[in-house]
From Swiss-Prot:
Functional summary from the UniProt entry: May play a role in the regulation of centrosome and Golgi apparatus positioning.
Statement: the UniProt record of this protein carries the keyword Transcription: no
Family the UniProt entry places it in: Belongs to the TBCC family.
Gene Ontology CC: one annotated term: cytoplasm
InterPro entries per UniProt: C-CAP_CF_C-like, CAP/MinC_C, CAP_C_sf, CARP_motif, TBCC1, Tubulin-bd_cofactor_C_dom
Keywords for the protein's UniProt record, in alphabetical order: Cytoplasm, Cytoskeleton
This protein's name: TBCC domain-containing protein 1
Domain called C-CAP/cofactor C-like: residue spans: 302-433
Pfam families: TBCC
Natural source organism: Gallus gallus (Chicken)
Amino acid sequence: MAAAVSLWPRTEPLLLGALPVPPPARLGPHYLRKMAAYARARAAEGCYPRLSWPRWRHIACGKLQLGRGLAWLYFERFHDLLPPPDPPRRLQRAEAEAACGSAEELERERGKLSVDTLRFLLFLYLQQLNKASLRTSLIGEEWPSHRARAAGLPGRAAGQSKNWNDQDHLAFLLTHLSDMLELLLEPEQLGASSHATHNSLVSYEAVCALSFLIEGTVNNSRTIHPLHELALWQPCHGQNGYSKISKTFSFPKLENWLRSCLIINPFGMTACLRSGKKLAWAQQVEGTTRRAKIACNTRVVPEVSPMVIMSQVYKQTLAKSSDTLVGAHVRIHRCNESFIYLLSPLCSVTIEKCRNSTFVLGPVEASVHVHSCDNIKVITVCHCLSLSSTTGCTFHILTPTQPLILAGNQAISFAPFHTHYPMLEDHMAQVGLATVPNYWDSPMMVCKEGSDASVFRLLSPLDFYTFVIPFEMEGDTTETPGGLPHAYQKALNQREQKVQIWQKMVKEACLTKDQRKQFQMLVESKFYEWLIQTGNRQQLDSLVPPAVGSKQAAG
């Protein structure tokens, strides 16, 4: 009886590894095959089986014509995917980089890093996930199309995000499986055309590398295994062509076996939408037909990060610090005119098609990606921030990597992280994020479009105010981690001095009781006008009483 093996694409490499932007032309399959041959031929120089940063920098800048910043971006992004993040080691590395006093010292520190060559090749190939398809853009779809209806939670119809769509993940693997397998072959296993032949053999090391992308299970059990463990399982040898003598796999048999076993990820977004737990975190706002939808996949196996998908939160304040969010991949979609606080350590966050809202996020271990949003504010400590197709958005961030400005952005404002909540520093330690280095003010223009000035600016200290999180929680953090840059702290101090002078002037004015009452009414009236003009009135109205609010934040 045939072994009932099920395989599927792993979520993290495709969700977090593939940049949500078309890759440079020189990261195409042809050039990656050349890179694979080059790396194997220079094994003694630090190219294989592990590729050092100096050797990758040479290949990327000298052979592939990539900029140094982009070369480091790919290298670091992959380095942080494997092995699974180790918070103490990540903090140690951040401390070492922050201690570097010059660019030369920083390069020497980075020169200590290396990555698995074969897996890195697969990671570079993954960048094709978001490659623009000329055929698709020319053909388009018949209108009205079934996809256009975004009923329910955001699936393929609503989001069009390949990084978040496990159906696209499976389609990508099936379409490109042969190319990726060839990329892992030893040179002598390739034919004259640089492609595999019927007699080509795939090494065990190559299948181990492919475990970066594929995992699975046997007989639908809840135990997940990496691909190489399942490939070595005795009942599968007849199907995948494994030879115990040569410790290799037959290329055509292995490819056919993989294709026959690959399915959509049973723990991915599709499963979350179809059978995930619905969360009653949001309120139904009177006078609107929009109904907020929030769902999570139940944590059915320890190897799988939870997912939380949030859609159509409208005109309200939502605050949560919950075990459901810890280590979760969060997708926030079509949330408008709201204030959303997710005060837990998160794995990744994607914010799409949101308008006129504020998002306060707990520390994010991997990445925050913001796409197609207008007039939103994001406040977070995160490892990486990337932006595409945003307009008029402000980002108060603390991040050890350069914010990535992709395509289609306008009027972005960057500002220092300016808030705290009691558990913030504990949560930062859990995900391995420190206060240094901090590149909030040094974004990288990955997609060059016009002048930098038309795309982003640094918020003026004159327009800077601290942000207060209005919920009670237990914890030790009492101030913004790392403090504020000097210019911003100085602006706050000057503003505070003006308030003190004004208070002293009022105190010394010797007003009568009636005058004090009249003056108080005037101040309250002006304050009320300011609340309405700034939109803060809506936030205050949507806040629940403190006792219930504390439960909401903690529950």
